[in-house]
Amino acid sequence: MKFVLLFGVLLVTLFSYSSAEMLDDFHQADEDELVSLIKKEEARAKECTPRFYDCSHDRHICCRSELFKDVCTCFYPEGGDNEVCTCQQPKHLKYMEKAAGKAKKFGGKIKKWFG
């Protein structure tokens, strides 16, 4: 009876080890594929227009800030007839980014206290 139990434990251990190796190989293949897709996407990306620069030639090309994409905002300057468009960050998104930064900083402090 002890021999059967010992043999069963050995069999389960070998099976779990082999399945863990298969899963590691599977995850490694997924990571390699994901990295290659990201590199292709970066190569395909166009140059973006920085904040407060003219975006009248393409209104969808503004750069991203930390969390949100800037928006091409058009307006007429005082005493002018021609429209001026610049990439800007709306105020509500600016406040949301500040709040997210403070929450992230506070989360780090809590993690340091309890972790």
UniProtKB/Swiss-Prot annotation:
<comment type="similarity">
    <text>Belongs to the neurotoxin 19 (CSTX) family. 01 subfamily.</text>
</comment>
<keyword id="KW-0732">Signal</keyword>
<feature type="disulfide bond">
    <location>
        <begin position="74"/>
        <end position="85"/>
    </location>
</feature>
<keyword id="KW-0960">Knottin</keyword>
<protein>
    <recommendedName>
        <fullName>U3-lycotoxin-Ls1r</fullName>
    </recommendedName>
</protein>
<keyword id="KW-1015">Disulfide bond</keyword>
<keyword id="KW-0964">Secreted</keyword>
<feature type="disulfide bond">
    <location>
        <begin position="48"/>
        <end position="63"/>
    </location>
</feature>
<dbReference type="GO" id="GO:0005576">
    <property type="term" value="C:extracellular region"/>
</dbReference>
<dbReference type="InterPro" id="IPR011142">
    <property type="entry name" value="Spider_toxin_CSTX_Knottin_CS"/>
</dbReference>
<dbReference type="GO" id="GO:0090729">
    <property type="term" value="F:toxin activity"/>
</dbReference>
<feature type="signal peptide">
    <location>
        <begin position="1"/>
        <end position="20"/>
    </location>
</feature>
<keyword id="KW-0800">Toxin</keyword>
<feature type="propeptide">
    <location>
        <begin position="21"/>
        <end position="44"/>
    </location>
</feature>
<feature type="disulfide bond">
    <location>
        <begin position="55"/>
        <end position="72"/>
    </location>
</feature>
<feature type="disulfide bond">
    <location>
        <begin position="62"/>
        <end position="87"/>
    </location>
</feature>
